[in-house]
Amino acid sequence: MKRSTLLSLDAFAKTEEDVRVRTRAGGLITLSCILTTLFLLVNEWGQFNSVVTRPQLVVDRDRHAKLELNMDVTFPSMPCDLVNLDIMDDSGEMQLDILDAGFTMSRLNSEGRPVGDATELHVGGNGDGTAPVNNDPNYCGPCYGAKDQSQNENLAQEEKVCCQDCDAVRSAYLEAGWAFFDGKNIEQCEREGYVSKINEHLNEGCRIKGSAQINRIQGNLHFAPGKPYQNAYGHFHDTSLYDKTSNLNFNHIINHLSFGKPIQSHSKLLGNDKRHGGAVVATSPLDGRQVFPDRNTHFHQFSYFAKIVPTRYEYLDNVVIETAQFSATFHSRPLAGGRDKDHPNTLHVRGGIPGMFVFFEMSPLKVINKEQHGQTWSGFILNCITSIGGVLAVGTVMDKLFYKAQRSIWGKKSQ
């Protein structure tokens, strides 16, 4: 009884060898099935060994962390002595005149070639970054009316209000809201060589390269002429020297601009740049952009509006890189305002500061790009079995159809 039950459950019924019928069509179908199965198995093996990147969108919970800013910008018609970089955000935090920390400034001649030392930031002095000083212990430099020095005669030397060097006079002028220009006829600036050197550099360009840390909130960074200063009325720059030098402008080349840690380093470490090529482009879409309008842009403001999306890359070798992708929209306008020359129906507001501005806005969402194998082991085995079974099933059906067709044709011929 038990044996007959097992016999009835046998789904693989056998036939005797001497009653089997073999045909040429069956042989061709069998060969085709073998080749098709091998092709599908090789394809499944390739998918199993392939690496894919699967994106995932989550809420960004790292709002307290700083975001790294990396940039390399060239201004062919702005000397390094006049360019300043400020970063401001909606929290009220300001990083003013930060080019002295974390950045290198390279002077460029009219042909765009480097001039002098890339780290040279001081226009006055003895060539070693120091300025000549007055060694008289009783010397008290004049502030030229920018500060009240009327009571100095009644004060001790250490209590007097003095402007001992050119930078002190310039700071006093900024606090008073006065135009400093090039420091001509100011004794401290003449002594330090500031006046002669800054005028010698007015026909040069500047390449600025470096990095800074910014908050993950809305704000802006801007390159503008002259020293920045802040008062109760807002944020300003001393543009006096820029205003009277008509050959200066903020036409520029963005060699590199990115937010977050660069991922090229990991690409080079793995020796597989092609695998990460798309990601590199997404994190720095403005690289190589050149802005040289065919009109006078002396009093012109160039603006980029960047939408930043925090991004994490998780690699198979357990390396995790936190960076950011961004898209940017470009806009430019004359400070004089009025109708746009290219679009007469567009009106520009009047006012502002000449320069290059990048207004950035952070997304509340984060993209996680995770590297994974194309298939798991279980998926690979399942797909292999499915491929083999499917090919055999189709081959069986085709063999039966061909056999019945042959029998039908032979039967008609025999009649």
UniProtKB/Swiss-Prot annotation:
It is a multi-pass membrane protein. This is ER-derived vesicles protein ERV46. The lineage of its organism: Eukaryota, Fungi, Dikarya, Ascomycota, Saccharomycotina. InterPro entries: Erv, Erv_C, Erv_N. It is found in: Endoplasmic reticulum membrane; Golgi apparatus membrane. It comes from Saccharomyces cerevisiae (strain ATCC 204508 / S288c) (Baker's yeast). Constituent of COPII-coated endoplasmic reticulum-derived transport vesicles. Required for efficient transport of a subset of secretory proteins to the Golgi. The C-terminal Phe-Tyr motif is required for exit from the endoplasmic reticulum. Facilitates retrograde transport from the Golgi to the endoplasmic reticulum. Keywords: Endoplasmic reticulum, ER-Golgi transport, Golgi apparatus, Membrane, Protein transport, Transmembrane, Transmembrane helix, Transport. Residues 46-376 are lumenal. The chain crosses the membrane at residues 25-45, 377-397. Residues 1-24, 398-415 are cytoplasmic. The gene is ERV46.
